[in-house]
Amino acid sequence: VAIFVVSRYVMDAENSYTRYEASKLASLVSAIRLPSSAFKSEAGTDVITDILVFKRHSSSTEYSINQSLGNLTYEAPYWVKDLSNIADENGNSVKFNSYFLDNKNIAGRLKVKSSQFGFTLDVAETAPLIEHLNRWTLTIPEFADVEYNPQETNANFEAIVAHLYIEMSGKQIGVIDRNEKGELYRI
């Protein structure tokens, strides 16, 4: 499990490359969008911040994803590409990640505000931040302990060593060669 505190642009950027790459490695377990004022006393500015909780994929899921990437059938989760619009009373709109609406994990009220760079998203504080965080943490699932399988780990290690040996020898899989005793074997 990994927890990141990031700018809203990780989740809201129209270019979804960062989210896409993250989705190949881990599942987004939970996330919360903090009010613009969450770090005002520390940073001296209003900035929308997200807390993202990821859990690394199991080896079987990772294998499945790699297979689908290889045959160009990988379908990223919706939080990678789904953006919603929010508009003010004058029709000025801003895009943001649909995940936060779908999961109701916004620690405040979304609105559009004018800035020196045009219109931008704002999250107005509606209650003390600690209340939002306490409610949110109760929604994060508990993770079961991962069972350690020494045979699987050893088999994976041996496969990696064999692959490295082949790569370092400069030989190709399927080639017939001689070992140290002069016996023929297939790589």
How should each PLM-predicted stretch be described?
Residues 28, 73, 78-79, 100, ...:
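Generic preference for hydrophobic/aromatic residues in regular secondary structure cores
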Residues 143-187:
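Charged, often flexible domain-edge or linker segments that flank or initiate folded functional domains
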Residues 1-40, 47-54:
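Conserved Class I SAM-dependent methyltransferase catalytic core
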Residues 41-156, 160:
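Flexible, glycine-/basic-rich loop-and-beta segments that form/coincide
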Residues 14, 21-24, 67, 116, ...:
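Residue-identity detector for glutamine
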Residues 3, 15, 26-29, 48, ...:
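Generic hydrophobic/packing signal
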Residues 8, 19, 24, 40, ...:
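Context-gated lysine
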